[in-house]
From Swiss-Prot:
Residues the record marks as active site: H188 (proton donor)
Gene coding for it: CPX2
Protein name: Coproporphyrinogen-III oxidase 2, chloroplastic
GO annotation, biological process: chlorophyll biosynthetic process; protoporphyrinogen IX biosynthetic process
A Pfam family hit: Coprogen_oxidas
Entry superkingdom: Eukaryota
Source organism: Arabidopsis thaliana (Mouse-ear cress)
Length: 233
């Protein structure tokens, strides 16, 4: 059974979530890496989080949001969660359609998965294509519980803030595109929305939320015109 791991990176102005899958039965972790100088014991803070195992699905659901979110109007079509999920799933469709149009033949293979407690994702892979050696375009919707120490470390909060386990919601899309042509750069992007609920022992506390993301390309051979084009679009 596949498990889910997530890595969070912080900077003075950002808080970034990267998600991956691994075929192991080991615990799920959040790993925090701090770019600025901090005391060694806190440089790499690894904490277990409550994330359920994935279940393969035969078809895509209308939404990966929890039904119980409706009690808090979180699953309504106007909520940020629902709007962001719709946006990343639309983006996945458009990116895959554009890649397949260039390929003129090879198609993406799709895996859909969910979790009993809510959340899930769609993974699409194309490999050995005419243009792309391998292309992956994924979306995921995740629910979990963040230890208070992890939240404080990520947000540089004081020890008095956010007591108790912190329920969280995260949704995002990510992609890595490797072309066959070595003179063409590898492209990567990821965009996500992260939200924490009130701590379990402090009901009614304010919800925290933020967006993050970025796009980059990694050339094996640098061409100045490629760099200029990338930064102009």
């Amino acid at each position: 059974m596949a498990s889910h791991s997530s890595t969070l990176f912080t900077s003075p102005s950002s808080f970034i979530l990267f998600s991956s899958h691994r075929l192991k039965s080991s615990p799920n972790y959040f790993t925090y890496h701090f770019p600025r100088s901090v005391k060694r014991p806190h440089f790499d803070l690894r904490c277990s989080v409550s994330i359920e195992k994935e279940v393969p699905e035969t078809e895509r659901p209308f939404t990966f949001l929890r039904v119980s979110d409706g009690d808090q109007t979180q699953s309504s079509s106007y909520s940020v969660r629902a709007r962001f999920e719709k946006m990343i799933r639309t983006a996945q469709d458009k990116v895959c359609e554009a890649i397949e149009a260039v390929e003129e033949g090879p198609k993406f293979k799709e895996d859909v998965w969910s979790r009993p407690g809510g959340g899930g994702g769609i993974s699409r892979i194309l490999q050995d294509g005419n243009v792309w050696e391998k292309a992956g375009v994924n979306v995921s919707v995740i629910y979990g519980v963040m230890p208070p120490e992890a939240y404080r470390a990520a947000k540089a909060a004081t020890s008095e803030q956010k007591p108790g386990p912190i329920p969280f919601f995260a949704a995002g899309t990510s992609s890595v595109l490797h072309p066959q042509n070595p003179f063409a750069p590898t492209l990567h992007f990821n965009y996500r929305y992260f939200e924490t609920d009130a701590p379990k022992d402090v009901p009614g506390a304010p919800r925290q939320w933020w967006f993050g993301g970025g796009t980059d390309f990694t050339p094996a051979y640098i061409f100045e015109e490629d760099v200029k084009h990338f930064h102009s679009v």
